């Protein structure tokens, strides 16, 4: 795996990755079971700012997923605004329209005994020509 921390690398890897995992920065509200006082430390401005950062990260890093490739967007938050709503909003953007929503899963601490967590699986659409080329390469 490789951690990408510059936009230069994102441009270099444009549509090159088979799989991308975005472990997005988040409010961390999924770990309230272990840190119950965390909810009192959060400010509304922080949540607003973190949602903007999440949208930017999702839009930027999705560009390195090649057609037919998969992207996982994950947070340790239980807030829909950081999770389902963030993915839904992304899918309406210019780059987001190039992806299909496959599935998502929300893990809640009171149901699972684990920390709260969210993950969504998206797949970048590929044209029939791109799919044909990919299948041909796999055969060779």
Description of each model-found segment:
Residues 38-65:
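Glycine-rich S-adenosyl-L-methionine
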């Amino acid at each position: 795996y490789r951690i990408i921390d510059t936009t230069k690398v994102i441009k270099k890897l444009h549509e090159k990755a088979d799989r991308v995992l975005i472990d997005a920065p988040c409010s961390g509200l999924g770990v309230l079971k272990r840190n119950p006082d965390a909810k009192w430390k959060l400010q509304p401005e922080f949540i607003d700012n973190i949602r903007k950062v999440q949208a930017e990260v999702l839009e930027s890093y999705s560009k390195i997923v090649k057609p037919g490739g998969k992207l996982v967007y994950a947070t340790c938050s239980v807030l829909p605004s950081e999770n389902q709503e963030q993915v839904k909003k992304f899918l309406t953007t210019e780059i987001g329209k190039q992806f299909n929503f496959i599935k998502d899963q929300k893990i809640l601490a009171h149901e699972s005994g684990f920390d709260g967590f969210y993950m969504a699986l998206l797949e970048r659409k590929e044209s029939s020509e791109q799919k044909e080329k990919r299948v041909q390469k796999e055969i060779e």
